[in-house]
Amino acid sequence: LHYFLAGLFTFLLIRTIGAGWVGALLGAVVYSFGGFMVTWTHLPSLISTAAWLPAGLLGVELAFRGRPLRGMLLLALALGMSLLAGHFQIAAYVWLVSLGSGAAHLVYRFAMRRRPGDTHPSPVGPAVALVAAVMLGAGLGAAQLLPSLELSGMSPRGGDRVSPEGYEFHRARALLPIELMTTVDPDFIGSPVRKNYPVWRISYSEHCAYIGVAGAVGVFLALLLGYRRPAVWLYALIGALALWTAMGGLTSYVYYFWIPKVGLAGGFSRLLSVFTLCAAVLAGLGVDALGKRTACSPTSCPPCARAWPLMLVALALTQALPWAYQFNPRTPAGQVYRPTELTRHLTDLANRGRVLEITEPEKWTLFDLPEALLPPNSATVYGYCSVNGYDSLLPTTYRRFADRVQQGIASPAANGNMILISRAFEVPICRYYVSSTPLLGEDELHGAERFRLVYSSAEGYIYEDRTARPYAAWRPDTEARAESAYDWESVQARRLGANRVRLEYIAAETGQCLLSEGYFPGWIASVSGQLQKPKLADETFMQLSLPYGDHRVDLVYRPASVEAGEFFSLLSLMAMIAVAVAARVSRRNCPESRT
């Protein structure tokens, strides 16, 4: 779907600029099957967001080409959908490039209007369209934007600050000059498919700048033959700035230190998304210029006049499609995360307690192939509860807790943002531990009170910690605060969904209930109809005050930021629909307005 959207919007963008269908088709192929879209398919949020970049630029072009209402609606849709797609670094590119293009159009329009006898329309209408699009786009994306802003304030990433050390860290991983050869040959350095990609380089996806031979020829033709078009210079400038920043040039300093938060996200090389699109637009304009230069006239017709542009499109398809299919072969869904005996046991244990997959952090780096027991996010696929995860999606309180357990940094920069706890076996923080090698010998297991071997095979080993605190535990207020996890009594708990938990208990006196659930604002507890907000306890968990008697407690995760975001998103969507319908009705009632 997102390959199609990326290609469709790129095609329409190039056509709107003024190129023919052949050039637009080449540009669509170059972007939708370029290095960024193809190699990031395994992380769908990136390509889902990048697909809206040409839509944003198309909205700007429409706004300045006599269709400000359509341009405003499309730009608002692109800005809002880029936020909803879920990858804020790429969404920032959509916003920056689209609005930067709009600003460039405004400057050009104002400059042209100052020339005597100029007939360009007033820039006021497009300027109003841009402002309205920003407001509607922000409102449309509020369902994702507001909760993410709340999470960033709680996340360990939210408190990060730019620093010279951080800048050098990103520059060391920037695109190298030799890697520019991947623009025409994606496997020039090597390929993970053929398993000859150098282990000393950062991931293949980060540094694949592929646009194809036909795309490169099209860019050259645009600069050689189509230089009279202002659009050629605009997209050449944007593409050059994106590429220079991706290579860690002077502009990367501005990008890192001057653009709030964006520089702290992934590496500079993800600006290849912008470069690839600009190259695609230039390729389309270049082929169009070639077609016009070689067009037949009443008196002469150059050899193969109409064939040259089509030959470039054919070359782009024959080079891009086999490579894309080889890199992302069609695979049955069941083969991606294939169930094994180990994962079946973990799924069976899902309702009994949390699981820690022990992976040594030093074995997980940005350069070496990770030696992990199970792939990241496998707990989500197989349906068990893991205590590992991404530090950008977990609160700072949990990161501090993980660092204390790890007796160091549980998520060092070298392994991205994975929280990998390997020393938790020494303290009872979860019920089950999974490892690729035995954690205890047979003599240590024999007669052990704490650990029990649940499963063992060539895949791995599962141990149960019988002293681990239950998911929900209770103690009366009359007791002194327990130092040990075993002093708490278990409370019957059932998870009714991702955001709902039910507790049932009978107590002879008032007490405190500690839940081994990460504390987030937004949890609301209903204790037999009485609402209560859980409190932060033991660094990262939740605690409730429970009255005596027979009670049922229903916990629901319903943060105000989500409800407010959904309200503003629906309001913006309704406003956009109302504007579109009103414009349609107006055109029907006033036929002369169509001319």
Predicted regions and their residues:
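Membrane-interface helix-loop-helix junctions at transmembrane boundaries of multi-pass membrane enzymes
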Residues: 110-128, 218-253, 296, 301-306, ...
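Signature aromatic-anchored transmembrane alpha helix within multi-pass, membrane-resident enzymes
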Residues: 130-135, 281, 287-321
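Extracytoplasmic
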Residues: 158-167, 318-490, 496-508, 518-520, ...
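Membrane-embedded helix bundles of polyisoprenyl
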Residues: 3-17, 21-109, 126-148, 315-323
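Active-site-proximal, structured, solvent-exposed surfaces of multi-pass membrane proteins
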Residues: 217, 244, 454-458, 463, ...
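Transmembrane alpha-helical segments of multipass membrane enzymes and assembly factors
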Residues: 9-23, 59-68, 225-229, 286-293, ...
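Hydrophobic alpha-helical membrane-interfacial segments at the cytosolic entry of transmembrane helices
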Residues: 117-149, 162-166, 235-243, 310-315
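Periplasmic/ER-lumenal interhelical loops and adjacent helix-loop junctions
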Residues: 137-223, 268, 344, 392, ...
